[in-house]
Amino acid sequence: MAKIYRETDADLSELKGKVIAVLGYGIQGRSWALNMRDSGLRVIVGVRPGKSRDLAKEEGFETYDVAEATKMADVVAVLLPDMVQPKVWTSEIGPNLKPGALVIFAHGFNIRYNLIKPPSNIDVTLVAPKAPGKAVRDEYLRGWGVPALVAVHQDYTGKALRRALAVAKANGFTRVGVIETTFAEETETDLIGEQTVLVGGLMELIKKGFETMIELGYQPEVAYFEVLNEAKLIMDLIWERGVYGMLNGVSETARYGGLTVGPYVLDNSVKERMRKAAERVRNGEFAREWLNEYEGGMKNLSRMLNEVKNHRLEVVGEDLRRLMRSGR
């Protein structure tokens, strides 16, 4: 059974008098910085000159270059894009960390695949909200929060978990619940979920359904509504009620058809391919492939994005979305 930490398991006094540097001021970084400041903590922002730094200044933060912010900080939240982190770590973060500093990542990718190798005299932890950055801020302001994961990779001070939980509490995560995990589990499940279900799986399922209906002679606009537009309604039901609750929220015809035809379309061969995709994540093959793609200028990614952009599903969808917005 998973260990879940809540409000009474975390103490903000662990961070009293400490300087917290949020590195990066994108959607996630901004939300963390604002939340922790509103929780009474001293927060500075490390970010390069540009629009993000200007925004941080406008919102009342002391801003510094990443290296300078790291030097000043007792707690360093690394909220830069994953693929930017290793280079910035080598040149600006790693050489400037105080002994005993707490470093927090929001995703375990670079630690899991040894792209960042931290020194032995710091604490290294993970605090990973399971929601987009905007929701992290919005739910905090609502007096609630979003669920998160916490993990300890390195505990130099003996206080790594306590301090990470304090950061989680300052962001509102312990109001909902913070699940203890490992860097490996967080990273692998995140990638496997994205590839096989959330991004890759859903996208391809919708595309294949759309293509099938078009090939059978149905109107593209009608097919779009059936396979994409209504997918949100079903996912909302699943999110609110679970899969069983969703089934009780649709018609008996939909319920029977889904339960009998769904396993035929997505049979155990799909699960076998999911396992193969998962193994590529677990053995590092996907990480190596993605790193090569990134360092090579992401030409394959650009090509694939253009293919999606020009797919008939997107062309039809753009027109229909414009039509639906026109009445607002």
UniProtKB/Swiss-Prot annotation:
Keyword check for Chaperone: no
User: Which residues does the annotation say bind Mg(2+) 1?
Assistant: 190, 194
Secretion signal, residue range per the UniProt entry? none
Pathway recorded for this protein: Amino-acid biosynthesis; L-isoleucine biosynthesis; L-isoleucine from 2-oxobutanoate: step 2/4; Amino-acid biosynthesis; L-valine biosynthesis; L-valine from pyruvate: step 2/4
Q: What does the record note about the cofactor? A: Binds 2 magnesium ions per subunit.
Taking every annotated instance into account, which residue ranges of this chain make up the domain KARI N-terminal Rossmann? 2-181
SUPFAM superfamilies found in the cross-reference section: 6-phosphogluconate dehydrogenase C-terminal domain-like, NAD(P)-binding Rossmann-fold domains
Q: GO terms for biological process?
A: isoleucine biosynthetic process; L-valine biosynthetic process
| UniProt cross-references to PANTHER family, sorted A to Z | KETOL-ACID REDUCTOISOMERASE, MITOCHONDRIAL
Q: What is this protein called?
A: Ketol-acid reductoisomerase (NADP(+))
Q: What is the source species?
A: Caldivirga maquilingensis (strain ATCC 700844 / DSM 13496 / JCM 10307 / IC-167)
Taxon lineage:
Archaea, Thermoproteota, Thermoprotei, Thermoproteales, Thermoproteaceae
